[in-house]
Amino acid sequence: MPEFTHINGDKVQMVDITAKGEVKRMARAEGTITLRSDTVAAIRTGTVLKGNVLATARIAATLAVKQTPQLIPLCHQIPIGAITVDFTDTEVSITAEVTVTSYGRTGVEMEALTGVSVALLTIWDMVKSAEKDENGQYPVTGISDIRVIEKIKG
């Protein structure tokens, strides 16, 4: 049976990291939102009514990274050294990639994953009127494949 560091019987606790040494940390995460091709084209050409979708998603991801300990209960507050947010697209999707670096006692995977998640949710929010069908449903739109693609310690 695996050993869980945050769980002791029916008690949940934040792991004590005070004895760990500080080292450089980096995590890169990505995730994808699937959209209608017309929506991706509107994002590319800057014709979405709400404004610049990717600039807004980039700001949202950056804010989310910095707020991760307020969203995930047992996540440590750590000093963030840098955040980069990049986007790539296909005809029917946009992939967000968030890289977070820090110098500290614990990793930054949760921060990178939170940044990706909020970037993709922001894109959805900004284009939802274009994505809905005649019944107000989202038959094409979906968020998937959110994962850590790289982690460096030291």
From Swiss-Prot:
<protein>
    <recommendedName>
        <fullName>Probable cyclic pyranopterin monophosphate synthase</fullName>
        <ecNumber>4.6.1.17</ecNumber>
    </recommendedName>
</protein>
<feature type="binding site">
    <location>
        <begin position="110"/>
        <end position="111"/>
    </location>
    <ligand>
        <name>substrate</name>
    </ligand>
</feature>
<dbReference type="InterPro" id="IPR036522">
    <property type="entry name" value="MoaC_sf"/>
</dbReference>
<dbReference type="InterPro" id="IPR002820">
    <property type="entry name" value="Mopterin_CF_biosynth-C_dom"/>
</dbReference>
<comment type="function">
    <text>Catalyzes the conversion of (8S)-3',8-cyclo-7,8-dihydroguanosine 5'-triphosphate to cyclic pyranopterin monophosphate (cPMP).</text>
</comment>
<feature type="binding site">
    <location>
        <begin position="74"/>
        <end position="76"/>
    </location>
    <ligand>
        <name>substrate</name>
    </ligand>
</feature>
<dbReference type="GO" id="GO:0061799">
    <property type="term" value="F:cyclic pyranopterin monophosphate synthase activity"/>
</dbReference>
<comment type="pathway">
    <text>Cofactor biosynthesis; molybdopterin biosynthesis.</text>
</comment>
<comment type="similarity">
    <text>Belongs to the MoaC family.</text>
</comment>
<dbReference type="InterPro" id="IPR023045">
    <property type="entry name" value="MoaC"/>
</dbReference>
<comment type="subunit">
    <text>Homohexamer; trimer of dimers.</text>
</comment>
<dbReference type="GO" id="GO:0006777">
    <property type="term" value="P:Mo-molybdopterin cofactor biosynthetic process"/>
</dbReference>
<dbReference type="InterPro" id="IPR023047">
    <property type="entry name" value="Mo_CF_biosynth-C_arc"/>
</dbReference>
<keyword id="KW-0501">Molybdenum cofactor biosynthesis</keyword>
<feature type="active site">
    <location>
        <position position="125"/>
    </location>
</feature>
<dbReference type="Pfam" id="PF01967">
    <property type="entry name" value="MoaC"/>
</dbReference>
<keyword id="KW-0456">Lyase</keyword>
